[in-house]
């Protein structure tokens, strides 16, 4: 139990008028540590108990069980709690040393599934930094949900259907080179796509031909289907090479095409429930009672189904297949209206499990303040960016530690980790400006800074030849150690907050705080001096490294032991 929860529970025993959660939220940290570690203001009880806050504080301080604390004193209208730092540090260190990387593992999920729709790039289009956010936020949330006891199901809902495939088939049949496509699938397919679109601007027959090929594809034509499948397979090979570099895996690659034969059921269900209304020849579902002004357009006047129809089919399939406790869509904020409609239509269909669906939105990545766009050529491709980040990391590692073994693997961990961490430390609803130099810096609030703190601790532990014993009691009570102990003790709550808010930046900021607190401790404390505190300090180092490494893992970032 963390200290705030302990204090709230002890106060609740003598103040039945307030819920423990309300007490927890009222607790304050005094500005001056001489006034205690935490304080409870008695003002909130004045009306209920009809007494002055000073009198309430004085009476309650007498009633609270002091055995868990160093002391409990009333100071004016506050009850001030002085924690038994030696006792708490001993408990926290024992928990981390005993559990190792399982420290702070929780069982909220009880093994239930969480479906995570993430990454989802378009086939035959380059994988840019714009796709990175959905990929790394989704991957981090998968780690967090697993730590909370859920079973994450990571779904890459590929953009593998649409009229652009008609254009691609026309282009490939005109100018395609099988060997070139196999060597560089995305580059070659993109060149073909750009070239055919340029030709279509002056030749109207191109569009007609593309429409005809897409119609053939929809009808299951053998040649069209084989070409589409080949474009998809070759693109996916290239995407998977990138995912391997990012250390991101998926449980399903069911993309848009997978739901082609599942949309008729959606239309039948909507029809059976009398939810479809005709509007200008199209079929819509009115959602005004959900505060949504624009109806959901289900089927166009020409009979074509729309994106939302496909997403309805996907939602039904995922519920039946995974029986999810939560279904999470990690998609840019520009799709907010779409996901509000999606949830509302499912609710209207009588599916209360739509309440378990969450759009985890995020802001844009810009470059020099400008929005990135594949169409305008203002795009940052991920593959060369990752390579550049690794090179920059390698240069810094070479300068700091030229004799480091396994330099390539460490440079990869630092370069890739730098890009991921920079993205994840940003509150997801905020965008950020892409700055590779800032990302790969070993100074400031960066991934390499946190990784370096972890590597520094591992170096200390190697020099000391120290491994903690689960049967030894370690304890510290000095102010610098206490700052670190408080953070380590707070780790389970940080994981829960990150999970509840679908917000990996909470975890990233925690990792930065812990690294900063340790570096401050390292600067002021002679850890390796041979005195009575040596093993206690080394146990603290061990616990800090364990939690730092786990915090980074939950962000999808590796923690090298040497840098």
UniProtKB/Swiss-Prot annotation:
Residue ranges crossing the lipid bilayer per the database entry: none
GO molecular function, one term: ATP binding
Keywords from the UniProt entry: Aminoacyl-tRNA synthetase, ATP-binding, Cytoplasm, Ligase, Nucleotide-binding, Protein biosynthesis
Enzymatic reactions: tRNA(Arg) + L-arginine + ATP = L-arginyl-tRNA(Arg) + AMP + diphosphate
Listed GO biological process terms: arginyl-tRNA aminoacylation
Classification via InterPro entries: Arg-tRNA-ligase (IPR001278), Arg-tRNA-synth_N (IPR005148), Arg-tRNA-synth_N_sf (IPR036695), ArgRS_core (IPR035684), DALR_anticod-bd (IPR008909), Rossmann-like_a/b/a_fold (IPR014729), tRNAsynth_Ia_anticodon-bd (IPR009080)
Ranges in a coiled coil: none
Keyword set includes Protein biosynthesis: yes
Domain of life of the native organism: Bacteria
Subcellular location, record wording: Cytoplasm
Enzyme class: ligase
EC id: 6.1.1.19
GO cellular component: cytoplasm
Principal place of residence: cytoplasm
UniProt xrefs under Gene3D superfamilies: Arginyl tRNA synthetase N-terminal domain, HUPs, Isoleucyl-tRNA Synthetase, Domain 1
SUPFAM superfamilies: Anticodon-binding domain of a subclass of class I aminoacyl-tRNA synthetases, Arginyl-tRNA synthetase (ArgRS), N-terminal 'additional' domain, Nucleotidylyl transferase
Position of sequence motif 'HIGH' region: 121-131
UniProt similarity note: Belongs to the class-I aminoacyl-tRNA synthetase family.
Self-association and partners: Monomer.
Record-given protein name: Arginine--tRNA ligase
UniProt source species: Streptococcus pyogenes serotype M6 (strain ATCC BAA-946 / MGAS10394)
Gene: argS
């Amino acid at each position: 139990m963390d200290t705030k929860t302990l204090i709230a529970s002890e106060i609740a025993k003598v103040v039945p008028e307030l819920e423990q959660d309300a007490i927890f939220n009222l607790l304050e940290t005094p500005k001056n540590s001489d006034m205690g570690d935490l304080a409870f203001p008695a003002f909130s009880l004045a009306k209920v108990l009809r007494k002055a806050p000073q009198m309430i504080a004085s009476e309650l301080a007498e009633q609270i069980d002091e055995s868990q604390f160093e002391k409990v004193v009333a100071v004016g209208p506050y009850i001030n709690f002085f924690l038994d730092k030696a006792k708490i540090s001993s408990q926290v260190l024992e928990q981390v040393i005993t559990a190792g990387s399982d420290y702070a593992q929780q069982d909220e999920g009880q093994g239930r599934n969480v479906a995570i729709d993430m990454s989802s790039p378009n086939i035959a289009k380059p994988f840019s930094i714009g796709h990175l956010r959905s990929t790394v936020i989704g991957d981090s949330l998968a780690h967090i949900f697993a730590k909370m006891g859920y079973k994450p199901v990571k779904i890459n809902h590929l953009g593998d259907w649409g009229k652009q495939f008609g254009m691609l088939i026309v282009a490939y049949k005109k100018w395609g080179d099988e060997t070139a496509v196999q060597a560089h699938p995305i580059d070659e397919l993109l060149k073909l796509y750009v070239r055919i679109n340029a030709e279509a601007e002056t030749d109207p027959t191109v569009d007609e031909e593309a429409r005809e090929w897409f119609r053939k594809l929809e009808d299951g034509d053998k040649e069209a289907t084989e070409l589409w499948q080949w474009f998809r397979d070759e693109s996916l090979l290239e995407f998977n090479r990138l995912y391997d570099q990012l250390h991101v895996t998926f449980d399903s690659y069911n993309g848009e095409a997978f739901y082609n034969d599942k949309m008729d059921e959606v239309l039948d269900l909507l029809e059976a429930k009398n939810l479809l209304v005709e509007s200008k020849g199209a079929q819509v579902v009115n959602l005004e009672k959900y505060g949504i002004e624009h109806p959901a357009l289900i089927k166009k006047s020409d009979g074509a189904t729309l994106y939302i129809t496909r997403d309805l089919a996907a939602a039904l399939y995922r519920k039946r297949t995974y029986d999810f406790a939560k279904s999470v869509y990690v998609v840019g904020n520009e799709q907010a209206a779409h996901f509000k409609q999606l949830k509302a239509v499912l609710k209207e269909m009588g599916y209360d499990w739509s309440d378990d669906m969450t759009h985890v939105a995020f802001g844009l990545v810009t470059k020099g303040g400008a929005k990135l766009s594949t169409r305008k050529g203002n795009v940052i491709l991920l593959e060369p960016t990752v390579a550049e980040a690794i090179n920059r990391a390698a240069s810094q590692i070479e300068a700091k530690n030229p004799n480091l073994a396994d330099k390539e693997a460490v440079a990869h961990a630092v370069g890739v980790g730098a890009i991921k961490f920079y993205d994840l430390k940003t509150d997801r609803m905020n965008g950020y400006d892409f700055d590779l130099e800032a990302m790969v810096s070993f100074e400031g609030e960066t991934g390499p800074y946190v990784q370096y703190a972890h590597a520094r601790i591992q170096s200390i532990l190697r020099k000391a030849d120290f491994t903690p014993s689960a049967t030894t009691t370690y304890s510290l009570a000095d102010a610098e150690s206490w700052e670190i102990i408080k953070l380590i003790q707070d780790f389970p709550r940080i994981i829960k907050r990150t999970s509840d808010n679908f917000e990996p930046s909470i975890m990233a900021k925690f990792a930065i705080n812990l690294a900063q607190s340790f570096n401050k401790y390292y600067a002021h404390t002679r850890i390796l001096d041979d005195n009575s505190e040596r093993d206690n300090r080394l146990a603290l180092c061990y616990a800090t490294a364990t939690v730092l490494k786990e915090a980074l893992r939950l962000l999808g970032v590796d923690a090298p032991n040497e840098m």
